[in-house]
């Protein structure tokens, strides 16, 4: 069964998209590889039926985004949901200053998640506590920001580019390209347009907050488009309306792991959960005649099955 990258529209939760896929595909076995906030759009990777076994191997995939960071105002959710809770007058930073601040966030770091997030502490969801007027002490999480590229600075959100085309560098402002739908702005704030490549677990809302703090002003994420998840680009994604007939991608295309071809006895042993002897070291995808057999971990002596797939 396929892996289907979907272009999530503005306003839907990731669970909304999963439910629509279940109805469209006629199956309850649908999962996704990483939540996208309701006010964000872009790539949400769905795994259908037997492909749901892949989710655990895809959740750590790196992601790319276009992010609009509004300077001079913030909100409890750190995005355009509002309401504004702090507003200060601010002028746009220079390109030199903005680039220097962004460069300071590239690399491994500890990031504090937003209060409005699904993180659990002591059995409590952070967003549930926040909606009730409270706040949890959220521990910082280790993340990696691979790259942050400043694509533009605007005096206000309405002047920031919204039309983009894919290039060799990623999605780039292009008046002949595709126009993205973004949330209504909370105000007329100077806005940074940033292209970001980050590890799994990175909150772009937290990044917006922290970039603002580095510039000495409150800030929030005014818009977000996820343009890539692992191997899947926004250009490869289907609309929610086209889920029923979407062909998607085969399971093998989803796994960015070294591959090893098995003969029939080895394939059978792995599918039975056995631990055959092997000099292979590290995690590998095992195939047989182009079919996915298993994901295994090798210690140089034997193979341990992490996940196996039944033969055709």
UniProtKB/Swiss-Prot annotation:
CDD domains: PseudoU_synth_EcTruB. One of its GO terms (biological process) is mRNA pseudouridine synthesis. Its EC number is 5.4.99.25. Transmembrane segments: none annotated. GO terms for molecular function: RNA binding; tRNA pseudouridine(55) synthase activity. It comes from the Bacteria. The keyword Secreted does not apply. SUPFAM superfamilies: Pseudouridine synthase. It catalyses: uridine(55) in tRNA = pseudouridine(55) in tRNA. The active site is at residue 37. Keywords: Isomerase, tRNA processing. Belongs to the pseudouridine synthase TruB family. Type 1 subfamily. PANTHER family: PSEUDOURIDYLATE SYNTHASE TRUB1, TRNA-PSEUDOURIDINE SYNTHASE. Responsible for synthesis of pseudouridine from uracil-55 in the psi GC loop of transfer RNAs. This is tRNA pseudouridine synthase B. It comes from Deinococcus geothermalis (strain DSM 11300 / CIP 105573 / AG-3a).
């Amino acid at each position: 069964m396929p892996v289907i990258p979907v272009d999530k529209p503005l306003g839907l939760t990731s669970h909304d998209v999963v439910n629509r896929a279940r109805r469209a595909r006629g199956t309850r076995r649908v999962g996704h590889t990483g939540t996208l906030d309701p006010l964000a759009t872009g790539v949400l990777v769905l795994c259908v039926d037997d492909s749901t076994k892949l989710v655990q191997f895809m959740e750590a995939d790196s992601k790319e985004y276009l992010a609009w960071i509004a300077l001079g105002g913030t909100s409890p959710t750190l995005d355009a949901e509002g309401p504004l809770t702090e507003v200060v007058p601010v002028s746009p930073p220079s390109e030199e200053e903005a680039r220097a601040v962004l460069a300071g966030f590239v690399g491994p770091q500890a990031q504090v998640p937003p209060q409005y997030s699904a993180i659990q502490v002591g059995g409590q969801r952070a967003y549930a506590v926040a909606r009730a007027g409270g706040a949890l002490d959220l521990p910082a999480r280790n993340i990696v920001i691979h790259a942050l590229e400043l694509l533009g600075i605007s005096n206000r959100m309405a002047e920031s580019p919204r039309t983009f085309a894919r290039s060799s560098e990623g999605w780039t402002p292009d008046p002949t390209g595709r126009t993205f739908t973004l949330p209504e702005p909370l105000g007329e704030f100077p806005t940074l347009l940033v292209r970001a490549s980050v590890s799994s677990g990175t909150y772009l809302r937290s990044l917006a907050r922290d970039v603002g703090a580095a510039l000495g002003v409150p800030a929030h994420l005014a818009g977000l488009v996820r343009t890539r998840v692992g191997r899947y680009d926004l250009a490869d994604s289907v609309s929610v309306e086209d889920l029923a007939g979407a062909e998607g991608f085969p399971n093998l295309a989803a796994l960015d792991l070294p591959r090893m071809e098995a003969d029939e006895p080895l394939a059978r042993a792995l599918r039975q959960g056995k631990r055959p002897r092997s000099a292979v070291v590290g995690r590998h995808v095992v195939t047989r005649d182009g079919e996915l057999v298993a994901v295994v971990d090798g210690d140089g002596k034997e193979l341990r099955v992490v996940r196996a797939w039944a033969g055709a």
